[in-house]
Amino acid sequence: YKESAISYYVTHGLAETEMRPTEIYWLHEVPKDWKETKLKYLLQKHKREIPEDAELLICSNSGDVKKRGDSKLGLVASSDDIYQGVHKGDLLIHGMDTWHGAIAISEFDGMCTPVVHVCTCNQSKRFVAYYLKMMAYTKVYKAISNGVRQNTSDFRSWDKVANLLIAFPSLAEQEEIADYIDGIVDSVNRMVSDYEMQIEQLHEMKHRVILDVITGATDIRNVQIPDYEFVDEEEPEEDSDIGSDSDEDETEEQED
């Protein structure tokens, strides 16, 4: 539901409106007042200096930015050549896992690998991030790119990313759409978290019951086991061959 909601609202908006054909070939139509352009006119790619004591950040396939343990700048050899700086609020686009939705706005200062495009945006970063994720959910990246390994899309070239087409409304409407999608995402994530917690509690309860029975903490000597009747499953009879000799004999007897 989350992916379908994102895909719908970033291409249709919140209100019903007149639609028009689009030059973006993976979209059938867009709201008539929306503009179309290439990403390079909305995003600016940066090569930032690495902050002191920067933590290594991962632009994950789950669509968020995570800290990678205790990996510090001082523990990484030749880090100036390998990594790049990230500022809180930067839009990150993973050049190899774009197809899987590895696109996110960083909540941290830190550093990341150069395969990730670190960008700022002159529009709503949240709207653009959701739009780019929509392209992953609808498999656009897989259709327009050949990965260098299985299950990848190769967007390491910034020119390839910069020339992707996007349709977008006014900045105010972008923020409204992003706010609405944020609400859906938060609601779904809370629901999933609640279910995961309930499942974990049931697993713990099951393990506790088993352990209590095995250790004797629960006395099961007087537990009544209900009677049941064992029913042996019969093997299915083999179907007779059509046109067998027995069938022919029966036919001849009927004719006689």
Model-identified regions with their sequence ranges:
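Ligand-binding loop in jelly-roll beta-barrel domains
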Residues: 120-125
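Sequence-specific dsDNA recognition surfaces
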Residues: 23-24, 37-88, 234, 240-256
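Non-catalytic DNA-recognition/assembly elements of restriction-modification systems
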Residues: 21-51, 167, 171, 175, ...
